C-alpha cells in the first residue's frame, strides 16, 4: 500500500492519546517493584507472591527514645541464609533489646567503620560500612560470644570474641553507652545460660601447664621461661614476648591487657638453635627451621642468656635433638665422636677408636690451653679378632684419607664437616642411649651420605592460632622469678662439661675412683705426651669398637676467628668480652667425672692416632 512514511504522523506530544489502551507491561513492573519494598502492611497485602520474596533488613536512623517507638522495633527481622544451594527466609529474631550506632574495628587493624549494632534476645547483629564502600554484616549467637571491656584503653570500647576471623572491637561514643551495652549483653547471655564476662570465666591452669592452640598440653613442666624480644627476620621490628621452654617444645606468649595470648609453638625436633650468626648481637641466638622464618631471640641480660643456653643444651641433649651449632666454639666445651674422623683447624685428622685417650699436645687450636676434653671410664674387653678387624679398618681409613687428602679442597672439607650424624630409619629402643650420646651438643660433625632421619620425616606444621588466653596471671611474676632462680636441668649425659677455673693437675695422679676434673697446661701436655710415648702406639692395645663415645677435638674448617691461645691462657673472645668468663665458669663448674688410670685396661687401647 505504499510507504508508511507517506502517512501523516501526529505530533510526538499527542501520539500517546491515539493508543487504544494503556500498556499493561509497565503496570506489572510497577506492582512487582512495590511488593519488594520494606516489610510492613504493604508487603503483607501482596499475598503469596510477596511471601516468596527475600528481604534484606536496612537499619534506620538512631532511635532516641526506645519506649516511645517500641511498636516500630517489633517488626520481623528478615535476612538471607544459605542452606545448600537454595536460599530460605529466616525466622523472626524477636524484639530488639538494644540498638545504637557505634564504631567497629577488627583487632590488629587500623580501619574504623561506622556500625549499626542491634541486640536481639539470642543474637547480635552488626552492619558496618567501610571507608572504601564495603559493607560488613554478621549475625552472631550470644551463646558463642565472649565480651570483655578494654580497661587500659583510652577509648570507651569492649571486645567481642567468638566465631570471627579476628576479635572485634566496638567503640562506643560515651562511657554511659558502654555501660549500657555491657549490661544488656551480660543480661541476655546470662538468660541464655552461656558464658558471661571474662572475669567470671573458669580458672585457668597453672602457668607451668599452659595449654596451646593445638589442644594438648606440653609434656612435663616448664624448664625455662623469661621475657625476651623476638625478631622475625628479615623484618627489623622486635616484639616483647614471653618465651617458655618445655622438654619437647618452645611456646611463645604475648602479654595482653586481659592476660596471656598464645602465639605459637615450636617443637624442638623441628628447629635448631644457632649461636653463630654473621650479625651477632649481644645476648642473642637464632631459632631456625626448614618451614619457618628465622627468629632472633634477644635476652634481657647476660645471666638470662647463659641460663637459656644451659637449659637448651640440656633439653636438646636429653631429647636427642640436633646439637647446638657453634657450641664447640665456647670455652670449656667438649666434642664427642663415635668412631669417625674429624678435621681440626690445623688440617690434622684424628681417629677415635671408641675409648678414651689421654690428653695430647696436638689438641686442636679451636680450644684454649686451659681446657681439654676430659676422660671417662670405658671397658676394653674385646676379642683378638675384633681388635685385628678394628686395626685393619683404621688402617684402611687412614690410607683412603692420605689418598684423597691432597685432592680435597677446603670447601669440600667444610662440606664434609657440615653433615650431621646418621640416624637409622627405624628407631630401636635399645639404642636410644647411644643415639642420644651421638646427637648430644658435644658431638662433632660427621660425614654421612644421608642426613635424613625419622625426626624430620614429618615436617612441622604450625597450629592455627586460636583465641586461647590465660586471664589469671597473678602468679606470673613468681613463676618467672622461680625460673630465673633455678639453675636449670643437669644434663643426663655421662660426659659432663669441663670447668675452666680448676687448676691443672697431673693426669697420672688420677685414680680409678671418683676424682675432680683436671685441666691441661703446657707442663701437663708435655707429661701426657711423654707418657703416651712410654706406652707405645695404639697397635699394642686392643682398640675399642668404633661406635663407643670418644672425646676428640673438632673445629670448623676455615673459621674466621680460630681459637689461638694467648699468653695469659685466654681465648681472643674472652679477652674482648670478660662476661664470657663469668658465664661459662658458672655454668660448667658443677661437673663431676671419673678419671681412669692411664696404666689400666680402660685406657690401654684408646690412644688417638694422628696422621
Curated annotation (Swiss-Prot):
One of its GO terms (biological process) is response to hypoxia. Residues 341-350, 498-509 have a biased composition (Low complexity). It is a lipid-anchor. The modification Phosphoserine is found at residue 559. Phosphorylation is essential for its mitochondrial localization and regulates its interaction with C1QBP. A lipid is attached at residue 2 (N-myristoyl glycine). It is found in: Cell membrane; Mitochondrion; Mitochondrion membrane. Found in a complex with cytochrome c mRNA and various ribosomal proteins. Interacts with C1QBP. Interacts with ELAVL1. Interacts with BID. Controls the stability of the leptin mRNA harboring an AU-rich element (ARE) in its 3' UTR, in cooperation with the RNA stabilizer ELAVL1. Decreases the stability of the leptin mRNA by antagonizing the function of ELAVL1 by inducing its atypical recruitment from the nucleus to the cytosol. Binds to cardiolipin (CL), phosphatidic acid (PA), phosphatidylinositol 4-phosphate (PtdIns(4)P) and phosphatidylserine (PS). Promotes apoptosis by enhancing BAX-BAK hetero-oligomerization via interaction with BID in colon cancer cells. This is Pleckstrin homology domain-containing family N member 1. It comes from Homo sapiens (Human).
Amino acid at each position: 500500500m505504499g510507504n508508511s512514511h507517506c502517512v501523516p504522523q501526529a505530533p510526538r506530544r499527542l501520539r500517546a492519546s491515539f493508543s487504544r489502551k494503556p500498556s499493561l507491561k509497565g503496570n506489572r513492573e510497577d506492582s512487582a517493584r512495590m511488593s519488594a519494598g520494606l516489610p510492613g502492611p504493604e508487603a503483607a497485602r501482596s499475598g503469596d507472591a510477596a511471601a516468596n520474596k527475600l528481604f534484606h533488613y536496612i537499619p534506620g536512623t538512631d532511635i532516641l527514645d526506645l519506649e516511645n517507638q517500641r511498636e516500630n522495633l517489633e517488626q520481623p527481622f528478615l535476612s538471607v541464609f544459605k542452606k545448600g544451594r537454595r536460599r530460605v527466609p529466616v525466622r523472626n529474631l524477636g524484639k530488639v533489646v538494644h540498638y545504637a550506632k557505634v564504631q567497629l574495628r577488627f583487632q590488629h587493624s587500623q580501619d574504623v567503620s561506622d556500625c549499626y549494632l542491634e541486640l536481639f534476645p539470642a543474637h547480635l547483629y552488626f552492619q558496618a560500612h567501610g571507608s572504601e564502600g564495603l559493607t560488613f554484616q554478621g549475625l552472631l549467637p550470644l551463646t558463642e560470644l565472649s565480651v570483655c571491656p578494654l580497661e587500659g584503653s583510652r577509648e570507651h570500647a569492649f571486645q567481642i570474641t567468638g566465631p570471627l576471623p579476628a576479635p572485634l572491637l566496638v567503640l562506643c561514643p560515651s562511657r554511659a553507652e558502654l555501660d549500657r551495652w555491657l549490661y544488656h549483653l551480660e543480661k541476655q547471655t546470662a538468660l541464655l545460660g552461656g558464658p558471661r564476662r571474662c572475669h567470671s570465666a573458669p580458672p585457668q591452669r597453672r602457668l607451668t601447664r599452659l595449654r596451646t592452640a593445638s589442644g594438648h598440653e606440653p609434656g612435663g613442666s616448664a624448664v625455662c621461661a623469661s621475657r625476651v624480644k623476638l625478631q622475625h627476620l628479615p623484618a627489623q621490628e622486635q616484639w616483647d614476648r614471653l618465651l617458655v621452654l618445655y622438654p619437647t617444645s618452645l611456646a611463645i606468649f604475648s602479654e595482653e591487657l586481659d592476660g596471656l595470648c598464645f602465639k605459637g609453638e615450636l617443637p624442638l625436633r623441628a628447629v635448631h638453635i644457632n649461636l653463630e650468626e654473621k650479625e651477632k648481637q649481644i645476648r642473642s641466638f637464632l631459632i631456625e627451621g626448614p618451614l619457618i622464618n628465622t627468629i632472633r631471640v634477644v635476652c634481657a641480660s647476660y645471666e638470662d642468656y647463659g641460663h637459656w643456653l644451659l637449659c637448651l643444651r640440656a633439653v636438646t641433649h636429653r631429647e636427642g635433638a640436633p646439637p647446638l651449632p657453634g657450641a664447640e666454639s665456647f670455652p670449656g666445651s667438649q666434642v664427642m665422636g663415635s668412631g669417625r674422623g674429624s678435621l681440626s683447624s690445623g688440617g690434622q685428622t684424628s681417629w677415635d677408636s671408641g675409648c678414651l685417650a689421654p690428653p695430647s699436645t696436638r689438641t686442636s687450636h679451636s680450644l684454649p690451653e686451659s681446657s681439654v676434653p676430659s676422660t671417662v671410664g670405658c671397658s676394653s674387653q674385646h676379642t683378638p679378632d675384633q681388635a685385628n678387624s678394628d686395626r685393619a679398618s683404621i688402617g684402611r681409613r687412614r690410607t683412603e684419607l692420605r689418598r684423597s687428602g691432597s685432592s680435597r679442597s677446603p670447601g669440600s672439607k667444610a662440606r664434609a664437616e657440615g653433615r650431621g650424624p646418621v640416624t637409622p630409619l627405624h628407631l630401636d629402643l635399645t639404642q636410644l642411649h647411644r643415639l642420644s650420646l651421638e646427637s648430644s651438643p658435644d658431638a662433632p660433625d660427621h660425614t654421612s651420605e644421608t642426613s635424613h632421619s625419622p625426626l624430620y620425616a614429618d615436617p612441622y606444621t604450625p597450629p592455627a592460632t586460636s583465641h586461647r588466653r590465660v586471664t589469671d596471671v597473678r602468679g606470673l611474676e613468681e613463676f618467672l622469678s622461680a625460673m630465673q632462680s633455678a639453675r636449670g636441668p643437669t644434663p643426663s649425659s655421662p660426659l659432663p662439661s669441663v670447668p675452666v677455673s680448676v687448676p691443672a693437675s697431673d693426669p697420672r695422679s688420677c685414680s680409678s675412683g671418683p676424682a675432680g676434673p683436671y685441666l691441661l697446661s703446657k707442663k701437663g701436655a708435655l707429661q701426657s705426651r711423654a707418657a703416651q710415648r712410654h706406652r707405645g702406639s695404639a697397635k699394642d692395645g686392643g682398640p675399642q669398637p668404633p661406635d663407643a663415645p670418644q672425646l676428640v677435638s673438632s673445629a670448623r674448617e676455615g673459621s674466621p676467628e680460630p681459637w689461638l691461645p694467648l699468653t695469659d691462657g685466654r681465648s681472643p673472645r674472652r679477652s674482648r668480652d670478660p662476661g664470657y668468663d663469668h658465664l661459662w665458669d658458672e655454668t660448667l663448674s658443677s661437673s663431676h667425672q671419673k678419671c681412669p688410670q692411664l696404666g689400666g685396661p680402660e685406657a690401654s687401647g684408646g690412644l688417638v692416632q694422628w696422621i
